[in-house]
Amino acid sequence: EHAKWQGQCQSCGEWNTLSQLSVAAGSSATTQRGGYSGQLAPLQTLGSVPTMDNERWRTESGELNRVLGGGLVPGSAILMGGAPGAGKSTLLLQVVSGLAERKRCLYITGEESLAQVALRAKRLKLPVDVVSVAAQTSLEAVFEYWDDYKPDVLVVDSIQVMHSEALETLPGSVSQVREVAARLVQR
């Protein structure tokens, strides 16, 4: 699946081998207008919007805190990117392990088994009894964990393998990644 028209397949280099796949209109939760109720929120001036100026959850990583402007802002969504093997999963596990000492944290792994995540945590000498983990690729199942556990911090590793049952496309496709990201941010 491609975000725009492609004449040549980027994987095999062949021309005119791609076929069009249409996603049914209205099947996406992101097609709703407004908020959850479908009602437009009233306009406000920036000065009237309440802010949590000083509330940030500092992580164990000084560099990550610096990049995030002082730490994690409650309610924010952060997308971490990088090349395979760059250490994204390791960094996320270190961060969530540090935060779990004082916040409820849930780590969802979609690419690795629970044994692999636990082995990495032990190798890094991270506290293994403070982070709740689940191996899952269904967004709807993740929402069930979220509703039951009510975490302060949710880590999804990785969004690329997550899928929503609301769409009939493959996990990792452009429409799936957009849908999953949009629904996670809305929540």
Where are these regions (language model features)?
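Conserved inter-motif catalytic segment of the P-loop NTP-binding fold
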Residues: 75, 83-86, 94-95, 99-186
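Walker A/P-loop
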Residues: 89
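Detector for small/aliphatic-rich hydrophobic stretches
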Residues: 3-78, 100-107
